[in-house]
């Protein structure tokens, strides 16, 4: 049974209507979740292509099934483009997600039970950097490092001292909620000083790295992992990079047959076309605008004494705001903003005192609104609308004003041009 879009609507109206409602939600909402973005129609077309039919266990030129000549071309395009973007000698484009990429990196670098240092979740790390609820924290002996309690910045002297004490086999750098530049060369110096390997998870900043607007970890890390969405503006998926041939072999084996079976070649195709977009000079302009818009929003909060920006500002696509002077917690803030069609997420802040289901902060990202065409003026307006909402949470007239302002912005910058 092969049918076109109109047949799909008639065949499964329930699913069609759900997708249509999500399209409407995305069009009419201001999206500030830092891990989300808006992909191109080319990315969606590739991901929805006939390649979804093809099973292709293995790697280009070394498949377990026949009929893979074409998908070999597709995957090779993705690999070569990824290598060109990040200046890496080897790339694996098959990971289904960033977590899968991290899992494969760990398998390639260490053994179960080995000691690993990773960034504390409340300081900005990720679940896969050693959280007890994650496979990482359950498989390896993770010891967390934190940001400085005063500056809320990475303290490399403290990290070195901690590394000398715990003697890790691996140090993991990278974050999901850290708004400042990360000096990967210092992390490599620390790793070398204690005889550890360095792995960098650059999932959040990969697009900025690709555009040359954040220092690249690739020359310093033994293995670099990333997602292909977020600031890279591709499909949801993972990517692993290295300059070490022996590690590249281990990575390939860790992905297949280690933790995955057949790759999702339709997603690999979507990665390939998104990588071509990243190689276009227009992407560097986009990435620069992401940072400008992030700073523009942060500046509005910095001028209001009722809010506190973690670490005092931002140098990338996101920042955290302590909202506890204005509302009870981050969850309350998230829910209030949902009501006015502004979407973001509650987020723990360094040395958090509330549960991760409530949190003291919210995380604000600029990647998706920038993809829609928002500039600094619109970004400042968005920050003002957030503040207006949180300070007038029980004033329905004010909240309706915010909804109208949100609608004006989303109408002015459609998700996709017809």
From Swiss-Prot:
Any one GO MF annotation of this record: glycine hydroxymethyltransferase activity
PTM annotation (N6-(pyridoxal phosphate)lysine): residues: 230
Domain of life: Bacteria
Disulfide links within the chain: none
Gene Ontology CC annotations of this record: cytosol
Principal location: cytoplasm
Keywords of this entry: Amino-acid biosynthesis, Cytoplasm, One-carbon metabolism, Pyridoxal phosphate, Transferase
EC numbers: 2.1.2.1
One biological process term in Gene Ontology: tetrahydrofolate interconversion
Location within or outside the cell: Cytoplasm
Binding-site list for (6S)-5,6,7,8-tetrahydrofolate: 121, 125-127, 246, 355-357
Catalytic activity: (6R)-5,10-methylene-5,6,7,8-tetrahydrofolate + glycine + H2O = (6S)-5,6,7,8-tetrahydrofolate + L-serine
Cofactor: pyridoxal 5'-phosphate
Matching InterPro entries: PyrdxlP-dep_Trfase, PyrdxlP-dep_Trfase_major, PyrdxlP-dep_Trfase_small, Ser_HO-MeTrfase, Ser_HO-MeTrfase-like, Ser_HO-MeTrfase_PLP_BS, SHMT-like_dom
Main EC class the enzyme belongs to: transferase
UniProt pathway: One-carbon metabolism; tetrahydrofolate interconversion; Amino-acid biosynthesis; glycine biosynthesis; glycine from L-serine: step 1/1
Annotated positions for site Plays an important role in substrate specificity: 229
Family stated for the protein in its record: Belongs to the SHMT family.
NCBIfam families found in the cross-reference section: PRK00011.1 (NF000586)
Subunit structure: Homodimer.
Function of the molecule: Catalyzes the reversible interconversion of serine and glycine with tetrahydrofolate (THF) serving as the one-carbon carrier. This reaction serves as the major source of one-carbon groups required for the biosynthesis of purines, thymidylate, methionine, and other important biomolecules. Also exhibits THF-independent aldolase activity toward beta-hydroxyamino acids, producing glycine and aldehydes, via a retro-aldol mechanism.
Official protein name in the record: Serine hydroxymethyltransferase
Protein's organism: Streptococcus pneumoniae (strain Hungary19A-6)
């Amino acid at each position: 049974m092969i049918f076109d879009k109109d047949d799909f609507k008639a065949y499964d109206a329930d699913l069609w209507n759900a997708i249509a409602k999500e399209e409407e939600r995305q069009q009419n909402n201001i999206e500030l979740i830092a891990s989300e973005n808006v992909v191109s129609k080319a990315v969606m077309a590739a991901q929805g292509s006939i390649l979804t039919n093809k099973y292709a266990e293995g790697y280009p030129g070394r498949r377990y099934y026949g009929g893979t000549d074409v998908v070999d071309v597709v995957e090779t395009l993705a690999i070569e483009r990824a290598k060109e973007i990040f200046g890496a000698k080897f790339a694996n484009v098959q990971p289904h997600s960033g977590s899968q990429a991290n899992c494969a990196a760990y398998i390639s670098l260490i053994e179960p039970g080995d000691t690993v240092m990773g960034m504390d979740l409340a300081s900005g790390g990720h679940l896969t950097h050693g959280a007890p609820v994650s496979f990482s924290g359950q498989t390896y002996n993770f010891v967390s490092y934190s940001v400085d309690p005063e500056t809320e910045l990475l303290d490399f002297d403290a990290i070195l001292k901690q590394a000398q004490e715990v003697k890790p086999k691996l140090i993991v750098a990278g974050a999901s909620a850290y708004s400042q530049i990360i000096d990967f060369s210092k992390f490599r110096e620390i790793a070398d000083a204690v005889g550890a390997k360095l792995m960098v998870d650059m999932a959040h900043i990969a697009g900025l790295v690709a555009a040359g607007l954040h220092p690249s970890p690739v020359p310093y890390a033994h293995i670099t992992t990333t997602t292909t969405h977020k600031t890279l503006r591709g499909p949801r998926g993972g990517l692993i990079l290295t300059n070490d041939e022996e590690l590249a072999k281990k990575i390939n084996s860790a992905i297949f047959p280690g933790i995955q079976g057949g790759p999702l070649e339709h997603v690999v195709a979507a990665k390939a076309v998104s990588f071509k977009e990243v190689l276009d000079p227009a992407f560097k302009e986009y990435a620069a605008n992401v940072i400008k818009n992030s700073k523009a929003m942060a500046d509005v909060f910095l001028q209001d004494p009722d809010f506190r920006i973690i670490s005092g500002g931002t140098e990338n696509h996101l920042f955290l705001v302590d909202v506890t002077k204005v509302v009870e917690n981050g969850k309350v803030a998230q829910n209030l903003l949902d009501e006015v069609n502004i979407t973001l997420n509650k987020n723990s802040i360094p040395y958090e005192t509330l549960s991760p289901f409530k949190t003291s902060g919210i995380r604000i990202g600029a990647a998706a609104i920038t993809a829609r065409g928002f500039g600094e003026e619109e970004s400042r307006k968005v920050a003002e609308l957030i503040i207006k909402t949180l300070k007038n949470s029980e004033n329905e007239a004010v909240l309706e004003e915010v909804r109208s302002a949100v609608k004006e912005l989303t109408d002015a910058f459609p998700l996709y041009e017809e």
